């Protein structure tokens, strides 16, 4: 199937997305039951029953798996889908590597990414060999394996895989050759590096540790970011206001300090805005990616609402945590 054939099908699936107005109605509800009544009129209707909130996370995962599988089978370039679902691949690598090292069974933490099964990943981690995984993934697995032979600190597994994830995003983005997609990937890496650097400054992390966690795949030079890690936050925030992200970051910088919680939310909203150009494109992969992103935002917002209603969050608490919804 070519993109000009797939994209009309994507447009049809977009009609299933929960609208801004419906989310606003759900925010205003006063109970889980009232929230469920509104969800009865959405694609999630089969998952609404007495006590639905207890199973909703598992049902969201089931919906996500079906979507990933359909897109992988339908997309002319499955790698486009993996650009988005790769975050789950690397989550699985973290979990299953820790299981291999500690001898624990962590299979229940596996998240289907549409590409690599639990068995394939476990076997690759155990044997260091795979005919099904890309060479780049095997290189990352071996790098982590070498680390684990020298260290028992499990946090290092997360650190290495997080950096490898960003490297793989950039590599695949360049390989696919879509300028708008590569721009989004680089912005994602830059904003991740900015968040990581700010957190490192606050936690007084060593230069050695920060060298390991900051990616060199963004547009802001790694050495530039590293130059701030032993300094004051004020110097870093002043620098940020000279970058291409200054207008965005002004919203989360106050009195030379950076609000990291708000930055994470702002990052999601900013990256979502990249995909809005997909509304005018009949060809290419952007409509597919826009839809995947919209579904991910929808899932995050639904989780927030269910947790919020269960724990009696105020309207203000819910609104300030909600991700931006774009009606595609």
From Swiss-Prot:
Name listed for the protein in its UniProt record: V-type sodium ATPase subunit C
PANTHER family, per database record: V-TYPE ATP SYNTHASE SUBUNIT C
Cross-referenced SUPFAM superfamilies: V-type ATP synthase subunit C
Superkingdom assignment: Bacteria
Function recorded in the entry: Involved in ATP-driven sodium extrusion.
Keywords of the record: Ion transport, Sodium, Sodium transport, Transport
Cited InterPro entries: ATPase_csu/dsu_sf (IPR036079), ATPase_V0-cplx_csu/dsu (IPR002843), V-ATPase_V0D/AC39_subunit (IPR050873), V-type_ATPase_csu/dsu (IPR035067), V-type_ATPase_csu/dsu_dom_3 (IPR044911)
Molecular function GO labels: proton-transporting ATPase activity, rotational mechanism
Disulfide-linked positions: none
Family (UniProt): Belongs to the V-ATPase V0D/AC39 subunit family.
Provenance organism: Enterococcus hirae (strain ATCC 9790 / DSM 20160 / JCM 8729 / LMG 6399 / NBRC 3181 / NCIMB 6459 / NCDO 1258 / NCTC 12367 / WDCM 00089 / R)
GO biological process: sodium ion transport
Record-linked Gene3D superfamilies: ATP synthase (C/AC39) subunit, domain 3, V-type ATP synthase subunit C domain
């Amino acid at each position: 199937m070519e993109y000009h054939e797939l994209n009309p099908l994507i447009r049809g699936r977009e009609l299933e997305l929960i609208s801004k107005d419906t989310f606003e109605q759900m925010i205003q509800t006063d109970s889980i039951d009232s929230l469920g009544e509104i969800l009865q009129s959405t694609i999630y209707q089969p998952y609404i029953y007495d006590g639905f909130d207890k199973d909703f996370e598992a049902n969201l995962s089931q919906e996500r798996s079906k979507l990933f599988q359909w897109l992988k089978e339908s997309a002319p370039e499955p790698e486009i889908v993996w650009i988005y679902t790769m975050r789950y691949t690397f989550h699985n690598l973290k979990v299953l590597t820790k299981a291999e090292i500690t001898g624990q069974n962590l299979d229940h933490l596996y998240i289907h990414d549409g590409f690599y099964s639990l068995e394939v990943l476990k076997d690759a981690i155990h044997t260091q060999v795979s005919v099904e995984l890309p060479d780049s993934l095997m290189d990352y697995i071996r790098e982590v394996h070498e680390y684990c032979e020298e260290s028992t600190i499990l946090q290092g597994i997360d650190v290495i895989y997080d950096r490898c994830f960003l490297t793989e995003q950039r590599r695949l983005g360049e390989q696919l050759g879509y300028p708008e997609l590569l721009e989004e990937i680089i912005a994602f890496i830059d904003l991740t590096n900015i968040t990581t650097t700010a957190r490192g400054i606050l936690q007084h992390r060593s230069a050695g540790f920060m060298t390991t966690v900051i990616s060199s795949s963004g547009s802001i030079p790694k050495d530039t970011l590293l130059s701030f890690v032993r300094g004051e936050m004020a110097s870093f925030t002043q620098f940020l206001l000279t970058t291409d992200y200054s207008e965005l970051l002004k919203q989360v910088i106050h009195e030379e300090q950076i609000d990291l919680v708000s930055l994470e939310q702002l990052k999601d909203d900013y990256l979502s805005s990249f995909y809005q150009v997909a509304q005018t494109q009949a060809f290419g992969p952007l409509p597919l990616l826009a839809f995947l992103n919209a579904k991910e935002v929808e899932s995050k917002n639904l989780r927030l609402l269910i947790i919020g209603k269960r724990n009696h969050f105020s309207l203000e608490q819910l609104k300030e945590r909600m991700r931006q919804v774009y009606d595609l």
